[in-house]
């Protein structure tokens, strides 16, 4: 156990030991100890006050005192008062710090703080942080605040159980707060409010003071509006937190510049938010992802995927964002949504697939094509299931087709076209597009199914086609 010596105090111990000795028995938490009260009174004002003898005609040579200190910490302080030496290790340092603060023994206070800062442990950071606030220990407070902010996800339960409004605010307003996105902070504040049953006023103040609303998803914004009971959210112009700040994005940067960075990425959308996932950056496949709100014209952070991806496909389902296949791991699947701590790996596909067509009906995810130019297999994943299953095969191979659900049917269109009906579990052929296409897109405009883009035989297709559900055929769209 490390020993720390107060050399200045040691020089005075001999003189103190020559003074008249008065024995005092101190009842502490967990035991009692007999001390020389004369020496202990010289140590700090606390002991002068608490060990003072009451005046009586016949003084008892031994007095009894009760102190609200644990016996182990008190013993260490008593030994220090006799010898000028204090024994500190990671097991006793926190309790000894608290006891020395209560007893005003400054040498032990600063020795304990220096020991904690030099050999910092996660297991006592929360308690030290709260002592830093309670007793105004600025260096301890600053160090523990930064540590908790950086290890926020690991310490979340301890924070909820122990922190009041002020303790919480200092952490959540930090640029160093390590969170995957800003929605996570909103969800955390709500959990803290429910668990601790705090006053609603504290919840409102926290939301207004710590949330960086310009990086919230629509889901996060709706949660804030619900809490604040308002239709418009407050404006915040703070910089993004370091944990979700993109190193390749300069601030500020417009949406077009961000989209250009995500070259050859996978894209999908939920409402007004478009998700850009993976692709090719700096001559390599990467695992970055970002969301762009084209209504509010701001970007929303997304944590990096578990795997880099190129030629993958994305689909929203089960209130999550799924990314399927692609290089370099064409059978891998993972999912995430705003407020989640990280992407979660999902069951692998039965076949490797690149740029497969994906769609979701009733939260069942369907994957078609992307395996080979002759493959007609399909796969599906039921909600809360841990394995993909083969579905009914398509009539044609759909190596570079696209899929979209329209009118309760799953349309699969590329060089050929067909649709899937979930109730009958069958595929039905429809007329092929007028212009066969690789990698086109299906969109819905004014309740019409439109086929746009794509290329064929190294030429891009600029003609838009509209589906006629009466004739099961395609027509050139005139914009009406």
Swiss-Prot record:
BTB domain boundaries: 10-90
Induction (record text): Expressed in the early phase of the viral replicative cycle.
Repeat (Kelch) residue spans along the chain: 273-319, 320-363, 365-408, 410-447, 448-480
BACK domain span: 125-223
Keywords from the named record: Early protein, Kelch repeat, Repeat
Pfam families: BACK, BTB, Kelch_1
SMART domains to which the protein is assigned, alphabetical: BACK, Kelch
Gene3D superfamilies on file: 1.25.40.420, Kelch-type beta propeller, Potassium Channel Kv1.1, Chain A
Function: Might have a role in the suppression of host immune response.
Family note: Belongs to the orthopoxvirus OPG047 family.
Descriptive protein name: Immune evasion protein OPG047
Chain's gene name: OPG047
């Amino acid at each position: 156990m490390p020993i720390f010596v107060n050399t200045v105090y040691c020089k005075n111990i001999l003189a103190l030991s020559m003074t008249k000795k008065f024995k005092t028995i101190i009842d502490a938490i967990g035991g009692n100890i007999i001390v020389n009260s004369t020496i202990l009174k010289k140590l700090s004002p606390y002991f002068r006050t608490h060990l003072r003898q009451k005046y009586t005609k016949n003084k008892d040579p031994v007095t009894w005192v009760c102190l609200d200190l644990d016996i182990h910490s008190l013993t260490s302080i008593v030994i220090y008062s006799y010898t000028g030496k204090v024994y500190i290790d990671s097991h006793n340092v926190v309790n000894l710090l608290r006891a020395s603060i209560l007893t005003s023994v400054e040498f032990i206070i600063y020795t304990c703080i220096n020991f904690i800062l030099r050999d910092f442990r996660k297991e006592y950071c929360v308690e030290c942080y709260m002592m830093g606030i309670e007793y105004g220990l600025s260096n301890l407070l600053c160090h523990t605040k930064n540590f908790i902010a950086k290890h926020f996800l690991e310490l979340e339960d301890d924070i909820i159980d122990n922190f009041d409004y002020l303790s919480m605010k200092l952490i959540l307003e930090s640029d160093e707060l390590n969170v995957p996105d800003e929605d996570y902070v909103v969800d955390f504040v709500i959990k803290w409010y429910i668990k601790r049953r705090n006053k609603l006023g504290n919840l409102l103040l926290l939301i207004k003071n710590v949330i960086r609303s310009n990086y919230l998803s629509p889901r996060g914004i709706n949660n804030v509006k619900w809490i604040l009971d308002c239709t418009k959210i407050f404006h915040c112009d703070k910089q993004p937190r370091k944990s979700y700040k993109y190193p390749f994005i300069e601030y500020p940067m417009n949406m077009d510049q961000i989209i250009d960075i995500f070259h050859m990425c996978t894209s999908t959308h939920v409402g007004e938010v478009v998700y850009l996932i993976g692709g090719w950056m700096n001559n390599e496949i990467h695992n970055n992802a970002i969301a762009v709100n084209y209504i509010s014209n701001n970007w929303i952070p997304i944590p990096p995927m578990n795997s880099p991806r190129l030629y993958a496909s994305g689909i929203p389902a089960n209130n999550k964002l799924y990314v399927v296949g692609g290089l370099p791991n064409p059978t891998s699947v993972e999912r995430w949504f705003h407020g989640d701590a990280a992407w979660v790996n999902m069951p692998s596909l039965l076949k490797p697939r690149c740029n497969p067509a994906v769609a979701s009906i009733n939260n069942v995810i369907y994957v078609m094509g992307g395996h080979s130019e002759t493959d007609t297999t399909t796969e599906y994943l039921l909600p809360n299931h841990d394995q993909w299953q083969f579905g009914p095969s398509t009539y044609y191979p759909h190596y570079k087709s696209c899929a979209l659900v329209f009118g309760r049917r799953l349309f699969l269109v590329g060089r050929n076209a067909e649709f899937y009906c979930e109730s009958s579990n069958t595929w039905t052929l429809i007329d092929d597009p007028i212009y066969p296409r690789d990698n086109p897109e299906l969109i819905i405009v004014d309740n019409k199914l439109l086929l746009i883009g794509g290329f064929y035989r190294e030429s891009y297709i600029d003609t838009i086609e509209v589906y006629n559900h009466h004739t099961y055929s395609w027509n050139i769209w005139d914009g009406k």
